[in-house]
Amino acid sequence: LAQRGITVDHTTIYRWVQCYAPEMEKRLRWFWRRGFDPSWRLDETYVKVRGKWTYLYRAVDKRGDTIDFYLSPTRSAKAAKRFLGKALRGLKHWEKPATLNTDKAPSYGAAITELKREGKLDRETAHRQVKYLNNVIEADHGKLKILIKPVRGFKSIPTAYATIKGFEVMRALRKGQARPWCLQPGIRGEVRLVERAFGIGPSALTEAMGMLNHHFAAAA
């Protein structure tokens, strides 16, 4: 915006994030939450809210693709179960994990046991606690923290969660998790995917037809 000579107050940008980040995560969720490896890595990292540490539960597959996330004021079996339940919600049977790797926190074991009992997780799902297997998610935490650090603390859990939703969905797009739905390469394809999700610009069909016409015209 600054390069275009447009001055926008930081509070305006903050309000945009709070309004649109959760909506963007909701509208794009179907696109970036597809094609996971059946081996999931679960872990939590710390996020400061009003001067106190909260817990950001996160899951990635063994390739490092983002599966889901959940911000909680507590680190407990209840929070772990809520996070895992959220990650599993909406997945077909064949999309659910065959293996879950966690740290040695007892909360995960309790949550996994309850979800199996409730039929939300296959009873054959293996629970591992192999430290080096979580290197991939610990590295991913670090990349996310680079984005969070300039914020210098959040004022409330809802505002923190809204901002993190924006960070997570944009990182998922940059990882290429929605690439099959991007009709154009690179950032332009990601931008158009977001625009289509909000009903901005041509539809996917119109865009695809336009690209084909351009291709044939260039080849003529």
Model-flagged regions — what are they?
Residues L1-W40, E44-K48, K78, R82-A220:
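Charged, often Cys/His-bearing segments associated with DNA-binding zinc-finger transcription factors
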Residues R50-T66, S76, L84-L88:
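Short conserved beta-strand segments at catalytic cores or DNA/RNA-binding microdomains
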Residues T66-I67, P97:
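Short, solvent-exposed beta-strand edge segments and adjacent coil->beta transition regions
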Residues P73:
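Short glycine-enriched, charge-decorated loop/helix-capping segments at active-site entrances
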